[in-house]
Every structure is written in C-alpha cells, then in structure tokens.
C-alpha cells in the first residue's frame, strides 16, 4: 500500500471513530428526572427516551404523555446530520432532524407540514450520566411551550 493511501485510510478511520464516539454520548436509556426538570404548561413530557444504533442510523424512541396527560409513543430513525427524517407517532411533527455540534451537544428541530413546531438543544454532561434537552415550540392548539427536561442515564 502506498504511503498516501495509508494516510487517507487512517484519516478516514479517525473521522469515523470520532463520529461514533460522539454519538455514543447520546446512546442508552434515559429517564426523566422531574425534580430537576422545568416542564412548561401545555408541554408534552417524555418520561423515557431510548437512543440506540440501528445499522448506520440512530433510532430514538420516546414514551411519555401529551399536554392533556394522554400516553404518547414516537419513533425516529435517521442520522445526526441535520437532515429531516420521518417521525412516527408524534402528533406535533412529521419530520425531525438532529445535528451533532460536538461530542456532547446536539441541535434538534421538528416540523409538521414543513413548518417548524419545535426546536432546541440537547447537551450530554461531561460524565455522560445526565442529558438535558431545552426545547421551545408550538403545540397542536397553537399554544407556545418551553421545557428544560433533565434525564438520568440508566
């Protein structure tokens, strides 16, 4: 193998590993810590979030309650590349995108009919034990909401 090919291969492996380890911070099962969270009036509440690798993609499954207290379950599969991917089971959005900013910081956006209904940031603590999601949006009745949800890794 030529030296140039070796260098290109090593750089490619390094970039792939960096992306995998960055995503690894988000992976796992996360339970809502209601005592540390600030759930705004009219906000949906995700009690459990499961983030797992599925092939080359990431699958995020959320279980919780809507603003009226009814159980919710939604699933999203895609990449942390900022592109929109379909979400199933979320009455407030039909697509969602996640963008990885660095190893522990992510941006999220949800759209319904092409219109942004929710956006925010997700931060994983340096020790990897806490995940904080700060989101703002508009619910199905047009009401505004803002939530800071703190999750503990299980």
PLM segments and residue spans:
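Intrinsically disordered, low-complexity terminal and linker regions enriched in polar/acidic
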Residues: 1-7
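Hydrophobic small-molecule pocket/channel-lining residues, especially in calycin-type beta-barrels
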Residues: 3, 21-154
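Bacterial N-terminal signal peptides
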Residues: 9-18
